[in-house]
Amino acid sequence: ISLVSCAHRETTYVYGSPLPVADPVFKGVAQIFLDREEGQVTGTAFAFADNGSEIYMLTADHICQEVGRGVIATTIPPHEGTREKYAGRVVYTSEDGDTCILRLEEASGAFEVLRFAPESPRTGDRVYTIGAPSGAFPTKTEGYVVGHDFLGTEADESDDPKMILITSVPAYGGNSGGPVYNERHEVVGMISAVHHEYPHSSISVHVEFLLTHVDIYFKQKSNLYFQ
């Protein structure tokens, strides 16, 4: 199986889709920038917790790669003025789950906290993502849930957390870490990669696996308020 990551390796500040007021997810998504040995990379992240002083965001591990790395998160472009920037650090990574957690300092209230879907998505559900493909942020695209593995099958009824979600949502460099969400604006996954043989499809980390990693991190930080 050949997968291609959706990180973008050139810093670009291109404004994407106009902000639709009706979609609250836009206010919970950030374009992120990290410095690595090969240069600066950019991707997408989304807020999932706010403890009153700090914002916690999820993104893809293949962007972050290591705990302690600095990150800059920027808000959506306003109609007038400049985007706000917030500094933070990588506080959790999981290579096998391609999941990374960021902590933004003094950023409480800067981003809307997105909700996780209480139920697993079903094949045929309409889903959306917001990201920074080729640096164009924010860009919203949509598609449908194809399945929960590379065969396009439904999820089984086991208690094991589902790991991946296949959708027909287009994804390109810069989309990595973007939320995949349903028509109720609930997160059902996170963009991770595109299938090399099927570029019209994207591979996401399933919401159940995201929650597993969130639980692992916050159990280690039990003194923090988790919303």
Each language-model region and where it sits:
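Gly/Ser-enriched beta-turn/beta-hairpin loop segments
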Residues: 79, 91-98, 148-165
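A conserved glycine-rich beta-strand in the N-terminal activation segment of trypsin-fold
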Residues: 17-18, 29-57, 85-86, 177, ...
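Catalytic-histidine neighborhood of serine endopeptidases
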Residues: 8-9, 48-96, 193
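Catalytic nucleophile loop of clan PA
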Residues: 46, 170-191
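C-terminal cap/linker of serine protease catalytic domains
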Residues: 9-20, 70-72, 187-227
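Flexible, gly/ser-rich surface segments that form the specificity/activation loops bordering the active-site cleft
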Residues: 112-162, 171-175, 191-202
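C-terminal motif of bacterial Sec signal peptides marking the signal peptidase cleavage site
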Residues: 3-5
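Active-site substrate-binding loop(s) of clan PA
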Residues: 13, 17-21, 46-48, 89-91, ...
